[in-house]
Curated annotation (Swiss-Prot):
Region (Disordered): 1-70
One Gene Ontology term of the molecular function aspect: putrescine N-methyltransferase activity
Entry protein name: Putrescine N-methyltransferase 2
Source lineage: Eukaryota, Viridiplantae, Streptophyta, Embryophyta, Tracheophyta
Enzyme category, top tier: transferase
Stimuli inducing this protein: Triggered by jasmonic acid (MeJA); this induction is repressed by 2-chloroethylphosphonic acid (ethephon), an ethylene precursor, that can by alleviated by 1-methylcyclopropene (1-MCP), a competitive inhibitor of ethylene receptors. Accumulates upon wounding and feeding by the specialist herbivore Manduca sexta; these induction is dramatically amplified by a pretreatment with 1-MCP.
Pathway connected to this protein: Alkaloid biosynthesis; nicotine biosynthesis
Active site residues per record: 238
Keyword terms, alphabetized: Alkaloid metabolism, Methyltransferase, Polyamine biosynthesis, S-adenosyl-L-methionine, Transferase
Superkingdom of the source species: Eukaryota
């Protein structure tokens, strides 16, 4: 593995029991233009876990853990229970998602974002950034398998792949199922996310040592802009929501840079929000992609239990060149059992039928997307 750092030094305040790792005293960085393992690095839910509150409690604000002093519940609402993490955001007003916290494993704050990892009662380890769930150990596999296998299953023999984000390592884990791959570049802006992976997900971080992998610590949008033209067979954008710093990853200039970096007939897959909440955002993303990608432009979706509304979408686009039929996989990983390395666990979610079904949309979404 080669590691290239392009980050500038920033200060971090580790608060009350946070775990500095690998000599980091100046914490973590916000996923902007290249984020970690899951899509939704929501900006409007910040995480706050502070000891020293009166009665040993912490205030519940925008994606926080509330604690009990043994006598009463403390928070913004009587419905907030102690020992639970709750995720709030302006992107889904009027609703929230909560998980029971068994143990707080890590918490840090930098100039960019809050990073928190806790053990949940139902989904194993849960990573949050700025108070928004990025990935759950036992519930995030549908998102990861689909963001990798929808694009790579649609082209024969992918060799050179770029991952924007993916610092925990779930996306890389899935990608290593393909023996045809010769080079994987991972651009992760947050070095502490990588450190969290090394400490708490060593089975994932071990894959960073694969000789085909180059881990770049830096800005994903800048990396793509500077990339060699027609170099990659596939680019996977595992980004946060299109607000704040990640907004650039959903705009036309970024898609133009991606298209330039892809070979003719190359493919890109990026997370593209929920059809239940964000049709206005999805329509704008599709409009940008249709202006840029001259091959095909498609929207797919899948179910993820710990994301808002329980679903997440993907944009799948190809550049002009050899035709790409995303809806009928030519390289389905579930059919090629010889491609699965012995050290990798079997697929939990993806199969050829799920691949095809991902492009079948409800009538209301189809009519809006096709209009």
């Amino acid at each position: 593995m080669e590691v290239i750092s392009t980050n500038t030094n920033g200060s971090t305040i580790f608060k009350n029991g946070a775990i500095p790792m690998n000599g980091h005293q100046n914490g973590t960085s916000k996923h902007q233009n290249g984020t970690s393992e899951h899509p939704n690095g929501h900006q409007n839910g910040t995480s706050e876990h502070q000891n020293g509150h009166q009665n040993g409690t912490s205030e519940q604000q925008n994606g926080t853990i509330s604690h009990d002093n043994g006598n009463k519940l403390v928070g913004n609402s009587n419905c907030i229970k102690p020992g639970w993490f709750s995720e709030f955001s302006a992107l889904w007003p009027g609703e929230a998602f909560s998980l029971k916290v068994e143990k707080l494993l890590f918490q840090g704050k930098s100039d960019y974002q809050d990073v928190m990892l806790f053990e949940s009662a139902t989904y194993g380890k849960v990573l949050t950034l700025d108070g928004a769930i990025q990935h759950t150990e036992n519930g995030g596999f549908p998102y990861t398998e689909m963001i990798v296998h929808l694009p790579l299953g649609s082209i024969p023999n992918p060799k050179k792949v770029l991952i924007i984000g993916g610092g925990i390592g779930f996306t890389l884990f899935e990608m290593l199922r393909y023996p045809s791959i010769e080079k994987i570049d991972i651009v992760e802006i947050d070095d502490v996310v990588v450190d969290v992976s090394r400490k708490f997900f060593p089975y994932l971080a071990a894959n960073f040592n694969d000789p085909r992998v180059t881990l770049v610590l830096g800005d994903g949008a800048a990396f793509v802009k500077a990339a060699q033209a027609e170099y990659y067979d596939a680019i996977i954008v595992d980004s946060s929501d299109p607000i704040g710093p990640a907004k650039d990853l959903f705009e036309r200039p970024f898609f133009e840079a991606v298209a330039k970096a892809l070979r003719p007939g190359g493919v890109v897959c990026t997370q593209a929000e929920s059809i239940w909440l964000h049709m206005h955002i999805i329509k704008q993303i599709i409009a940008n992609c249709r202006q840029v990608f001259k091959g095909s432009v498609n929207y797919a979706w899948t179910t993820v239990p710990t994301y808002p509304t329980g679903v997440i979408g993907y944009m799948l686009c190809s550049t002009e060149g050899p035709e790409v039929d995303f809806k009928n996989p030519v390289n389905p990983i579930d059919k090629e059992t010889t491609q699965v390395k012995p050290k990798l666990a079997p697929l939990k979610f993806y199969n050829s039928d799920i691949h095809k079904a991902a492009f079948i949309l409800p009538s209301f979404a189809r009519s809006m997307i096709e209009s």
